[in-house]
């Protein structure tokens, strides 16, 4: 790689040579220190100036230099800032030589005594300094140097150094995932890991990534869902299971979609769609309570998570909106209706597909407050149980908040004969051009033949969930390293 260095970058490399001539180790292997900056502030910030002077608290710490001015440095570590005072007349010559060669971005070790300045700022009066890692790049200015969104994503490590709000987002993401685990662990769910590489495509409607498994001389898919192996575990006697893991869908990128994302799927024996709606609502409210959030501001909307989540039947909502009865519509009339509203009817479409397209066109945009939409057509729900009152529809629901879908749940289909027929229908769709349709998974059908107890299941996209609770409108803002086009 031919790297053209800026003037500042050249100067910093020249400083390395000067430091080495002074016998300074430029890149240390490790160092021991007393307290990190956060702990120092927590422990000593309440002390008065006189208390610190009287007791002479000596300690060492480390951090990245973010400010150099006169006789002061400001260090940053783990999101906190801490001032260092350099008593130039008292410091040993070797430390003065080191100070002259320090730059913003360098990581250093400092030992000294705690004090407070005239303005009351907790400060470490240095008596020893050590360079731990020399920064050869110039950090961008927080307000003017890192405004390009693509550059922020491409150099996320720099983004994290200079933008505190970005750091807070990812700390909160980690906390949300921990809360999800806490919620399900407290309910005695078992966390499991299932294979990322799958020989059969299934568990969701999505285009896959395909890879070659050399040892088996076969093509495998990167999983598009964890549903089928998790339900096999319920067959095997684990009544409550969940998995948090990476999912891969070879599809487009937009503000709410990334080809690689994190999801949680959870399954509970002797539950159903109603039970999953209740469980999912309780999970969202649990997270909000733990984060001390009563309302959420997202995508320009104020979301109230305290109230009971609304329940809305998909077809009944459309019937009211369009003034027709979609329960009784013929396929020919459905195609005419689709054409009227500029919906492309694919070769594999049936009435259920058109109903779903109409829902996405007319209803989704109005689903602001938390709403469970239920009663999905069987054609788009190959793994969900048929509704007893109308077998053309299923006991399935999706949770919408702020016009976005966050969770998909249903009463699981436990009948292996029906499941095989549904898989065959999916395969027929695939043969007729639906790249997102499932393949026939005979191994899963065999698992059902051993007996799957009545089961409810749900999947949630964790990245979207984090977007909701951090008020970020782009999924890239909640992914540490989002996928980007090559420069």
From Swiss-Prot:
> Which residues of the sequence carry a binding annotation for Mg(2+) 2?
405
SUPFAM superfamilies per UniProt: Class II aaRS and biotin synthetases, Nucleic acid-binding proteins
Q: What PROSITE patterns does its record include?
A: AA_TRNA_LIGASE_II (PS50862)
List the subcellular locations: Cytoplasm
List the lineage, top down. Bacteria, Bacillati, Mycoplasmatota, Mycoplasmoidales, Metamycoplasmataceae
A GO term from the CC aspect = cytosol
Q: State the organism named in the record.
A: Mycoplasma mobile (strain ATCC 43663 / 163K / NCTC 11711) (Mesomycoplasma mobile)
Per its UniProt entry, which superkingdom is the organism in? Bacteria
Q: Which GO terms describe its molecular function?
A: ATP binding; lysine-tRNA ligase activity; magnesium ion binding; tRNA binding
Q: What is this protein called?
A: Lysine--tRNA ligase
Q: Which CDD domains match?
A: LysRS_core (cd00775), LysRS_N (cd04322)
Q: Which cofactor does it need?
A: Mg(2+)
HAMAP family in alphabetical order: Lys_tRNA_synth_class2
């Amino acid at each position: 790689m031919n790297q053209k260095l800026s003037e500042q970058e050249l100067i910093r490399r020249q400083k390395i040579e000067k430091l080495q001539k002074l016998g300074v180790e430029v890149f240390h292997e490790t160092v021991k220190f007393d307290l990190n900056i956060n702990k120092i502030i927590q422990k000593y910030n309440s002390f008065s100036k006189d208390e610190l002077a009287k007791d002479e608290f000596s300690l060492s710490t480390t951090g990245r230099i973010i400010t150099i001015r006169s006789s002061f440095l400001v260090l940053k570590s783990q999101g906190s800032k801490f001032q260092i005072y350099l008593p130039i007349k008292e410091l040993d010559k070797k430390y003065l030589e080191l100070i002259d060669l320090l730059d913003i971005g360098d990581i250093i070790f400092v030992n000294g005594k705690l004090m407070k300045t005239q303005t009351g700022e907790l400060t470490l009066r240095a008596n020893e300094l050590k360079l731990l890692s020399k920064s050869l790049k110039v950090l961008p200015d927080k307000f003017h140097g890192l405004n390009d969104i693509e550059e922020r994503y491409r150099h996320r490590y720099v983004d994290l150094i200079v933008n505190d709000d970005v750091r807070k987002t990812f700390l909160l993401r980690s906390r949300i995932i921990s809360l999800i685990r806490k919620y399900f662990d407290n309910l005695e769910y078992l966390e499991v890991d299932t294979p990322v590489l799958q020989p059969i495509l299934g568990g969701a409607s999505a285009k896959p990534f395909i890879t070659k498994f050399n040892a088996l001389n076969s093509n495998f898919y990167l999983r598009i869902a964890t549903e089928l192996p998790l339900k096999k575990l319920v067959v095997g006697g684990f009544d409550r299971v969940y998995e948090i893991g990476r999912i891969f869908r070879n599809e487009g990128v937009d503000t709410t979609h990334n080809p690689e994302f994190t999801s949680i799927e959870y399954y509970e024996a002797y539950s159903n769609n109603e039970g999953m709606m209740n469980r999912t609502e309780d999970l969202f409210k649990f997270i909000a309570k733990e984060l001390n959030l009563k309302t959420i501001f997202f995508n320009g909307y104020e979301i109230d998570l305290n109230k009971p989540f609304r329940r809305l039947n998909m077809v009944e909502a459309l019937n009211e909106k369009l003034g027709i009865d979609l329960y009784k519509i013929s396929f020919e009339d459905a195609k005419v209706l689709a054409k009227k509203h500029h919906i492309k009817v694919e070769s594999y479409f049936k009435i259920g597909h058109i109903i779903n397209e109409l829902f996405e066109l007319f209803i989704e945009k109005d689903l602001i407050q938390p709403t469970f939409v239920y009663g999905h057509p069987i054609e788009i729900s190959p793994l969900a149980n048929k509704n007893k009152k109308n077998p053309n529809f299923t006991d399935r629901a999706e949770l919408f908040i702020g016009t976005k879908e966050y969770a998909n749940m249903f009463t699981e289909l436990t009948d292996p004969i029906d499941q095989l027929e549904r898989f065959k229908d999916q395969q027929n769709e695939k043969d007729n051009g639906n790249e997102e349709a499932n393949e026939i998974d005979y191994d899963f059908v065999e698992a059902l033949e051993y007996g799957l107890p009545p089961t409810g299941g749900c999947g949630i996209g964790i990245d979207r969930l984090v977007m909701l609770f951090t008020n970020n409108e782009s999924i890239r803002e909640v992914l540490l390293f989002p996928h980007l086009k090559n420069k």
